[in-house]
């Protein structure tokens, strides 16, 4: 906190020690910080939201960490589906009140075949299963745009590489971290890039 404060950033964190956690860090004043947007039956630290003012409009920021869901034949997968359903329900409500929303974080969703190095090996994975991808598209259909795909229609853009089997060196990655924004905010965005430098040092 002190490091961010020394650089004039305001930070809000919702975490579980050694487990889940989300945060919002901003140079603009944050208001209406919430960690109770959805009904999470396991009460895990997976979502935080805050409002900022931009050109006299309120923009809602939502940072998420969606459950992984693997293995698919366990309660972990059911939890992921329920969690995503609760998020979609909340987005429907939020979208009616505010048409300026930025939803970002680790979605643990591979949206399409071009978003993973070997799609066949993930066909029955909780990150790529059809019903999970449908839930992701349901979010988009609420009036959101996938910012990376908006600027890069077919370009590879991995955000995660496993720490085993030389995944980084082989570029065996996947795109599971996303920025979804209300469509009317797209004209406020100039570009989007994935910073691979921190991962290259691990």
Locate each region found by the language model.
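Active-site beta-strand/loop signature of hydrolases that rely on acidic residues for catalysis
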Residues: 1, 61, 87-115, 147, ...
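Catalytic metal-binding/acid-base residues of hydrolase active sites
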Residues: 65-67, 108-110, 152
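Structured beta-strand-rich core segments of catalytic domains in phosphoester-bond hydrolases
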Residues: 1-71
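Surface-exposed cleft-lining segments at the edges of enzyme active sites
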Residues: 38, 66-85, 120-124
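Metal-dependent phosphoester-hydrolase catalytic domains
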Residues: 3-5, 32-36, 93, 113-202
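Internal, well-ordered alpha-helical segments in soluble enzyme and binding-protein domains
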Residues: 21, 83-90, 135
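Soluble or luminal CAZymes and related metallo-dependent hydrolases
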Residues: 42, 79-87, 128-131, 172
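Alpha-helix C-cap/termination motif
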Residues: 53-55, 93-97, 142
């Amino acid at each position: 906190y002190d490091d961010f404060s020394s650089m004039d950033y305001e930070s809000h964190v919702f975490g579980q020690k050694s487990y889940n956690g989300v945060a919002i860090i901003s140079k603009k004043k944050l208001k209406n910080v919430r960690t109770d947007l959805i009904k999470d039956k396991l009460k895990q630290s997976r979502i935080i939201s805050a409002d900022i003012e931009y050109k006299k409009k309120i923009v809602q920021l939502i940072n998420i960490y969606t459950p992984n869901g693997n293995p698919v034949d366990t309660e972990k997968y059911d939890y992921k589906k329920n969690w995503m359903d609760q998020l979609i329900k909340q987005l429907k409500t939020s979208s009616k009140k505010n048409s300026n929303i930025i939803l970002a974080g680790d979605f643990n969703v591979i949206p399409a075949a071009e978003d993973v190095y070997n799609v066949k090996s993930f066909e029955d994975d909780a990150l790529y299963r059809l019903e999970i991808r449908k839930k992701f598209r349901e979010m988009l259909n609420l009036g959101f745009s996938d910012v990376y795909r908006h600027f890069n229609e077919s370009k590879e853009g991995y955000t995660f590489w496993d720490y085993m089997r030389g995944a980084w060196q082989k570029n065996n990655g996947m795109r599971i971290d996303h920025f979804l924004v209300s469509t009317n905010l797209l004209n406020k965005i100039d570009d989007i890039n994935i910073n691979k430098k921190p991962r290259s040092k691990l």
